C-alpha cells in the first residue's frame, strides 16, 4: 500500500501540492485525474523520489521514502516501473536495448537471461520479433508498448503511468488500456495512473481521485465519480465549458485585467 499524507510542494510562490492526502491500495489501479498544470506529474515525481516535497509523508508498505537517503531511495526505486508520457525511448538504442536498459544498468541478470526477459516482456505487450527495430521505425502505439515492456522488465511491484493514452488514436488507446488491466490482473502490480482521458480512467481504474488546487477533493469508484455531486468534479468529468473551474479562471482574468 502507498499512503501519502500532508504532501506539499511549491515552486517559488506557486503552490502545486497543498497538504495532499491519498491512499493507493495494494494490487489496485488508482487513477488521478485533473486539469493540465494541476500537479499530477509532480505527485508522481515525488512518489519515486525524483522531487523532494516541502512537507508530508509518502509511505510505501510503512516506510517513509521522503526521509530516506540516496542509497535507500535507489533500493526503493527498484520496486517501481514507469511508463512516461512520450514513452521516452532512447533514440540511439534499438527496441531490445531499450527494454533491457534497466536490467543491464543494475546488472540484474546474466546476458542470456536478459535477452529472454526482453523477448518475454515484448510478447506480453503484443510485440514479437521487433528487437532490432529503432524507435524511429515505430508507430506511436508501438512506442508506448515498448515503453511498457521496459517498465515491467525489472519485475516491479508498483507501476506509474504518466498519461498513457495521450497522442494515440481511440483504437490504440484502448489497446493500452487493455494492457494496463491485464498487467494488474496477471502480475498483481499496484498502479498509479495520471490522466485527463476520462474514457481511459473509467475503464482501467479501481478508484479515481480528483486533484484540484493541490488537494485530492474526491476519491471514488468509477461509478461513484460518474454520479458525483461535487460540482468541480462533475464539470471536469463531463467536460463542460461552464462551471466552478472555468468560472473561477474567468473571475481571476477579470481581476488582473482591472
Give the predicted meaning of each segment.
Residues 48:
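Helix-to-loop junction immediately C-terminal to a conserved catalytic motif
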Residues 63-64, 111-129:
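Conserved ABC ATPase "signature" region
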Residues 92-101:
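Short coil-to-helix segment of the ABC ATPase nucleotide-binding domain corresponding to the Q-loop/switch region
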Residues 134-138, 142:
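Conserved ABC ATPase signature
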Residues 155:
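Conserved catalytic motifs of ABC-family nucleotide-binding domains
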Residues 159-162:
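Catalytic Walker B motif of ABC-type/P-loop ATPase nucleotide-binding domains
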Amino acid at each position: 500500500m502507498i499512503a501519502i499524507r500532508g504532501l506539499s510542494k511549491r515552486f517559488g510562490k506557486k503552490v502545486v501540492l497543498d497538504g495532499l492526502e491519498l491512499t493507493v491500495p495494494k494490487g489496485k489501479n488508482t487513477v488521478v485525474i485533473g486539469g493540465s498544470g494541476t500537479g499530477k506529474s509532480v505527485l508522481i515525481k515525488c512518489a519515486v523520489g525524483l522531487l523532494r516535497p516541502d512537507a508530508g509523508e509518502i509511505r510505501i508498505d510503512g516506510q517513509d521514502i521522503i526521509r530516506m537517503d540516496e542509497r535507500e531511495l535507489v533500493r526503493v526505486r527498484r520496486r517501481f516501473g514507469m511508463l512516461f508520457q512520450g514513452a521516452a525511448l532512447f533514440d540511439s538504442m534499438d527496441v531490445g536495448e531499450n527494454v533491457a536498459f534497466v536490467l543491464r544498468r543494475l546488472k540484474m541478470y546474466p546476458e542470456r537471461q536478459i535477452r529472454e526477459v526482453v523477448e518475454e516482456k515484448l510478447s506480453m505487450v503484443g510485440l514479437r520479433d521487433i528487437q532490432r527495430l529503432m524507435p524511429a521505425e515505430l508507430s506511436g502505439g508501438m512506442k508506448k508498448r515498448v515503453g511498457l515492456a521496459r517498465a515491467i522488465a525489472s519485475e516491479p511491484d508498483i507501476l506509474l503511468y504518466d498519461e498513457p493514452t495521450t497522442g494515440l488514436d481511440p483504437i490504440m488507446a484502448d489497446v493500452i488500456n487493455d494492457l494496463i488491466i491485464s498487467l494488474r490482473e496477471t502480475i498483481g502490480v499496484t498502479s498509479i495512473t495520471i490522466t485527463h482521458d476520462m474514457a481511459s480512467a473509467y475503464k482501467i481504474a479501481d478508484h479515481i481521485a480528483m486533484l484540484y488546487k493541490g488537494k485530492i477533493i474526491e476519491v471514488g469508484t468509477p461509478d461513484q465519480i460518474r454520479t458525483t455531486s461535487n460540482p468541480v468534479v462533475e464539470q471536469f468529468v463531463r467536460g463542460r465549458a461552464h462551471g466552478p473551474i472555468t468560472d473561477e479562471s474567468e473571475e481571476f482574468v477579470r481581476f488582473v485585467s482591472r
